[in-house]
Each structure stands twice: as C-alpha cells, then as structure tokens.
C-alpha cells in the first residue's frame, strides 16, 4: 500500500522536488497508480489560478484512473519522460517512473500512517505554496482538467525566470489588493515590483530638508538656525521671519545709512550767509534754514546778521570749568572773618591800623540783659569794650578810674583806639572779668 515510502528510502529526491512544497511534488508515479492515497485539491486563490504560467509549457498529462476504493478518486501520475526537457526537473525515464515523493510535508520527520495525516500535510503544503507564490504543479485530467506546467515553456518565454515570475505575481496581487484592499494589504506586497504607487514614508520629508537646498526669499541666506515661512508659504531665514512677524514688513536688505551730523547736513545752507557748516540749524520766520549764528542774531537784535560778520570757522566759547576750588578767606581768633590782605602783607603801619579799627567797629559784643538798663547807649558801650579789649594788662587801672557815666569815658577811650593794632586770644576772657567788675562795682 505504501510502496512510495520504500522507494523514497532507496532513491533520494531529485533537485527541486520539494521546491516550496508544490502540490505536484506529492503526486505518485505510474508504478503507484493503484495506491489509495488521496491528494486534495490545492487551495490556491482564483486570481493565481488564472496566471499564464499555469497554462501550457509542458507535455500533456496522462489521463487519471479511478479506483473503486473508500478513498475516492485516485491520483493520476505523469508518464515516464514527461519533464525531460526541464533543467531543474529533468531525470531518466526509469528513475522518474520508479521514484515517488512521500505524501508528507518536508517539515515533518516521520512518515504519515493514515490518509488523514497525508491529506493534512498536503493541505498545509498547498497553503504554503499559495502564500509564498511558488505554487503550481501537475494535476490530472480528473482534477479539474488542469495541465502540468513544465520549465521548458516557462524558461523559454522569459529570459530570467524568477524576476519575470515575481513581476507577474506582483501585478496580479496588486490588482487583487486594489479590489479587496483587505487581506492582501501587507508589508510583503509593498516590496513587490508590481506595486503601483507605494505609500510615501513620513520620515522622507525630514531628509528632504537636508537634501534640498533651501534659500531665504528675502535675503537669500542658505543656512539658518531655524527656517520659517511667510504667509504665502515661502521659506524665510530666522532673522527675516522674526522681522516680518514683529514689524509686519520685509526685513530691509541694506542697512540704513547713519544720519549725518547737524553740522554737515546734505543740501542745507544758511539762507542769510550761505554757510553749510554750523553746530545747530535753525529756522527763521519764513521757515528757511539758517545757521546758529544768524538765527541767534536775528532773535536777539531783530535784524538779519550782517554778512561782514561771517567767519569761515565755527567760533566756540571757551567755557570755564565748572569745578573750581573757591578761595576761602582766613578767620580771626574769635571766628570772625578777616579781609584777605592783612597788615603783614604791607610794611605800612597806618594801613594796618585803619584795617583793624574798621573791623573792630563792626564787631558785635554779647551783653547781658542788665546792661541795657544801666547804660542807655548800647552802641557806644560795644565800641568801648571792643576798644578796651586791645589794651591788655592796662585794662584794670583804666576801668577802675573811669567810674563815670558812659558819656564821660567814651571819648578818651575812642582816641586811644587809633593805636590798637594787635589782638590776643585771651582778650575775651579779660573782658568778661572786667565786665563783671564793672557791673558789680
């Protein structure tokens, strides 16, 4: 019953016998035609069954014989020498008749013992053939009347079998995928040559930024830290884009020229003296530009500045520095201010006497409140005490002798005041003692 298994042990499989597990590899030879093993119909999509490589390209298969067994229709085998012209399947007639491939999938290492296992293996092989696009094989006339394809016609019609076959399958599958767009939409179909327009990878846009040379439409910059776009979609560099965003206008390409100084303003000349250089441009009553000199002259005098006063250069004032150390006048022993020119600067004693007497006359003296009641003339008393303060040791005899009214001793003391020219620091203390003596006497 299982002669094919014994034959498979003696003879090794020829090259290409298990190529992708095609259904033709499980067909028995003529010697095993009476075997009751059933080979099911391969489950190949209808779009693949109508391909050109399944039609023609080999010798006609022999008519299958039907055996009256419980397994159903018997397999039909190919005659000896059917595939002698094929380079991959060519073998001798005796060997081709004797060899019969095992009815199991090459994935299993043990032979099938029942018909159901062989049928399941054949079905799995058929699914693999349909999935990987390597299906097809020899089928008898009893199995839908299909013919066994051969390599001679296939190789003869195409220069390179695999690319042409893949292109044909890819085109047909692309058409089926376009019709259904469901089970055929897989990454494998995207890589087929027959795929019409594969989807664009989203990351390719990122590479376009490096491959495509962008240029700023405003300034023509080729590189920038950040590319921006204006309202119309044109590319702008970072500087031009920020300028347009903040100001609403295009960034100026040429830097604006620096404003000329007022002294050299282009196109201006004084309407009165026709000078072109001035520190300040003014306007007259008519609105015409005039130089600073003519404008000030007209403002101060009310008449135009005479042309004879025009000078080629600009005359500027020599301003005095603001931080000048003011000269401080020397102070006297009691804190009063003395004139800067004292008697020591001149050898004339009369000048020294007159200056000291004038300062003594203007010097006030503190008096107690009781003095004004005893002495009615406070001014004469102040002069008297200021004059007496310069005499020094002779203060006590003079004051003790003059115990009269203020009118009596004012005149002799005033006469002696002309000769007083020296002041001592202790005169104020002596005056206080003598004053106390006068008040208490």
Swiss-Prot record:
UniProt PTM: Methylation at Lys-299 attenuates transcriptional activity.
ZnF locations on chain (GATA-type): 216-240, 270-294
Assigned GO CC terms: chromatin; nucleoplasm; nucleus
UniProt xrefs under Pfam families: GATA (PF00320), GATA-N (PF05349)
Positions of post-translational N6-methyllysine modification: 299
PROSITE patterns found in the cross-reference section: GATA_ZN_FINGER_1, GATA_ZN_FINGER_2
Name of the protein in question: Transcription factor GATA-4
Species of origin: Mus musculus
